[in-house]
Amino acid sequence: MQAPVVTETCQTNEEGEQLVLRLRAPVERPRVTWGAGVIDNEHMGRLKSNCCCIYTPPRVWDDPSTWEPEEHETEHCRGHTLPEKKQKPQGGHGSDKDEDKGNCGCDHC
């Protein structure tokens, strides 16, 4: 059994024109930038910050999943998950230590 023979006819450019592809580095390297709503806590006399630094990955223009914030992010403290609500034992009270923490569940609040 023989394989079928395929014949292709190609036209060549007789003028001898050459195309040159030159690769160039991006104009700017990726870097950290601050949004307009970021507050500088270092020089405001505050003792602590409620949130840590937040990295926002670049968005892909044709991928809607990169447009919206993650589900685990909250309005005031992005990047941290909300703690699960613990039910207090019936007839008793939960510890005051847990009630003093902020809503985001991170160790900064």
From Swiss-Prot:
Molecular function terms, GO-annotated:
protein phosphatase 1 binding; protein serine/threonine phosphatase inhibitor activity
| GO CC annotation | nucleus
Among the Pfam families in the record, one is PPI_Ypi1
Compositional bias (Basic and acidic residues) at which positions?
73-87, 94-109
Q: Where is this region: Disordered?
A: 63-109
Provide the protein name.
Uncharacterized protein ZK945.8
